[in-house]
Regions:
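Mg2+-dependent endonuclease catalytic cores in nucleic-acid-processing enzymes, primarily RNase H-like
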Residues: 1-114, 156-168
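Charge-patterned, long linear interaction tracts outside catalytic cores
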Residues: 96-154
Length: 168
C-alpha cells in the first residue's frame, strides 16, 4: 500500500493546492473526497468543489445518520471504522502512527446508551496528541454513514447532495 501523506502548517489555499496536485496524479480518481469541515477544512472543501473535485465537507460534531445509536457523527464514523476493522481481513497502510492512533482513542456509552468517542480535550488530558491520521481514516466512512440507513442521494447540477446531517 502507498504511504500516508500528511500536510502540516499549510493555509487554506496551500492545502487545497496540495490535495488538487495529489488528485491530479492519481491514475484512478477518488469518487469522493471527505474533508473535516471544522476549522480550515470548510474553505478547502468549497475550493475543491469549485475546481470540480468530488469534495464533501463533513462536520463530525453534527447529528449522526443513525441518531439513536451514536452521540454524534464523529462517534458513528469511529464506530463504523472499528466494526469494519474487526469484521474483515483488512490491510492498512504500513503506518505506525495511524495504527497507534486507531487503538488509542477510547469509546464509552452515554447514560442513554449512545456510543461516545473520547473527545480531543479528553485525549489531551491523558497526554495524547490529536489523532489526525486516524480522524482522516474514519472520514472515509462518511459515505457509508449515509447509506447505512438508506440515506437519500440526489444529483443536482452535477453534484451529489446527501440528505443526512453532517454531510454537505
Amino acid at each position: 500500500t502507498e504511504p500516508i501523506r500528511l500536510w502540516r502548517n499549510l493555509d487554506t489555499m496551500q492545502l487545497t493546492g496540495a490535495i488538487k496536485a495529489e488528485y491530479d496524479e492519481c491514475q484512478e480518481k477518488p469518487v469522493e473526497i471527505f474533508v473535516d469541515a471544522i476549522g480550515l477544512g470548510a474553505g478547502v472543501a468549497d475550493r475543491l468543489r469549485e475546481m470540480g473535485l468530488p469534495a464533501y465537507a463533513i462536520n463530525v460534531s453534527e447529528s449522526p445518520a443513525m441518531g439513536q445509536h451514536y452521540l454524534n457523527l464523529r462517534a458513528e464514523l469511529w464506530y463504523k471504522a472499528k466494526n469494519w476493522l474487526e469484521g474483515r481481513d483488512v490491510k492498512l497502510p504500513n503506518d505506525d502512527r495511524l495504527k497507534s492512533e486507531l487503538v488509542t482513542v477510547r469509546y464509552t456509552y452515554t447514560s442513554s446508551g449512545r456510543v461516545k468517542i473520547e473527545s480531543k480535550a479528553e485525549l489531551k488530558k491523558r497526554g495524547v496528541a490529536s489523532p489526525d491520521s486516524a480522524d482522516a481514516f474514519v472520514l472515509t466512512f462518511a459515505s457509508d454513514a449515509g447509506t447505512a440507513i438508506g440515506g437519500r442521494s440526489s444529483r443536482r447540477m452535477g453534484k451529489i447532495r446527501r440528505a443526512i446531517a453532517g454531510i454537505v
